[in-house]
Amino acid sequence: MFAIFGTGGFGRELVGPAKAMLGSRAEGLVFVVDDPHGPVMGIPVISTDELSERDEVIVAIGDSALRQSVADRLKARPGALIAPTNIIGPDVEIGEGAVFCDFTMVTASARIGRHFQCNIYSYVAHDCVIGDFVTFAPRVCCNGNVHVGDAAYIGTGAVLKQGSSGKPLVIGRGAVVGMGAVVTKDVADGAVVVGNPARPLQRP
């Protein structure tokens, strides 16, 4: 079986690319949840207890901490969902559990961590290093020589300025880059930045 954990919006969005990727294996596509119910979009919904180590699963949860918590407890092995419209260039390493939605791209010599989610029309350019459990919302522009720390969230339409081989642009662990932000400088661990140019959000 190839299982999608979660029947929320993102999980349902992944049905199309999953079927396209699986081809003749698409009959084995299921949703998996902790408390199963009837079919969703014609896809069977099973319990986590029904998964085995022979099955593959991807976790369709946007929240990084929750995604990691679920991934760590599932018995099935992490799969990868790479939409047929995705383009992956040479010398690219992709970690287990990664999801590349339709019309995404990784150009060359990039390192992609475990359970990365790359939503529609986002790209990762040359020599980038993406950590584990990172989320890219739609239309993220991650230019060359950018390092993104574990569990960071990059919002819709954000632009990450190109770094250099000697000084990559760094997005810290657990940082949040707001939608439409233009990031020209490093972002600290756990920081929230918004705007153009992106600046730390002033909290009340």
PLM region descriptions:
Residues P36-I87:
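Phosphate-bearing ligand-interacting subdomains
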Residues L29, D55, E96:
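Conserved acidic residues
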Residues V15-P17, S69-R73, A188-D189:
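Short amphipathic alpha-helical segments
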Residues F10, G62-A65, R199:
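Short glycine-rich anion-binding loops that position phosphate/pyrophosphate groups of nucleotides
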